[in-house]
Amino acid sequence: MPYGLYFSIAGLGIFVAAALWPPQRPRVLANITYILGMVINEIPHYGALLLAIWLGISIVSGDFGTPADITVAVALTALVAAGLFALGWRARTSRAIVAAALRDAGIEPARSSNGHATRRGWQITLFPFAVRPRSVVRERNVSYGPHRKQQLDVYYRKDRPTGGPTLLYLHGGGYFLGSKHHEARGLLYRFADRGWVCVSANYRLRPRAGFLDHMVDAKRALAWLHEHAGDYGGDGRRVVMSGSSAGAHMSSISALSQQDPRYQPGFESADTSVSAVVGLYGYYGPYYGDDWNAALPSSPLVMDASSAPPFFLTHGTVDNNASVENSRELAAKLRAEAPTRPVYAELPGAQHGFDLVSSWRFEAILDGIEDFTDAVLPVSVNRR
């Protein structure tokens, strides 16, 4: 009896179940299922490949002693394969959903069904990891303030084209952890390769830092980008602010508090304007310990959005780290108050952290972000 095969398939089944049905509570169980299901949720085809390899090895090795052994193996394999198929199907719907969200905001999705998307789809199916193109340079650990955590990495093309917009990315991690090195690599690489100047910044974290410290860091990074984008060929007048989870929280507040001196004490006159926002699986409620009526608002949901720049928001329906309700509420607020209708793409089956690998889902989102920025921030890049 091939017990090793049975245990392997059952183990994979646990990962698949965690991705399909992650609980919201209790918190400990939610965190465990998030960790177990995060990767397989984005690249289920690799799970299917493992199933095929394990089954093939058992057949070649003659591990099946009786027909009952074969029946059990086939039943387990079919059950887990069905779960993997469901994960893949949910991920593949993302492109149509992003396209519909763009159309809802009055933007025609140029990249949703063209040959470029198909070619890239094959590439990420075979190799689902973001690799920095040879055309893109990364300049590491540039200081944007006096604190040791106030450092950023700059991504730009080797040939330094001029006139491209700029992008500031802030990582997630609940304000407790995370760094500029891990999330949204595909976003930074793709836009840098297009001729943008892209920046990924660290910021001070809890428990040594509080809400105003985080916002000061976000604003200082913005001010640095406005001042220094031209050093790398970028146009500092056009800045897209983006982030994942906590980074999306900071980005949204920064966009709704442009030039507000309360959020940038000590450098009140610095340019911290934002041209557009991209929020990935963001938390948009109040900061730890704050209430909705805090003197210094820590939630975009209670801030004035009448002058808000264009927003692109996306969130997964099974996110058990930051509720999708937050994004729904922010999208509704922007529709009611903002000058431009937001793009809001709600992705079936997407979990927190979907930007950690290059997947079908994240590729569809990146195509949507390109369409969004092309519409609200026309790109004019001069190649040298």
Stretch-by-stretch model annotation:
Residues 2-31, 37-52, 324, 328, ...:
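C-terminal catalytic histidine-bearing segment of alpha/beta-hydrolase fold enzymes
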Residues 15, 22, 32-60, 64-65, ...:
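N-terminal cap/lid segment of alpha/beta-hydrolase-fold proteins
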Residues 163-174:
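Short beta-strand element of the alpha/beta-hydrolase
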Residues 181-199:
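Short amphipathic alpha-helix adjacent to the substrate-entry channel of hydrolases
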Residues 220-292:
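Primarily recognizes the serine-hydrolase "nucleophile elbow" in alpha/beta-hydrolase
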Residues 285-286, 318-322:
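Acidic catalytic loop of the alpha/beta-hydrolase fold
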Residues 300, 309, 323-333:
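Short alpha-helix in the alpha/beta-hydrolase fold that links the catalytic acid
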Residues 307, 313-315, 319:
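Short beta-strand/loop motif that positions the catalytic acidic residue
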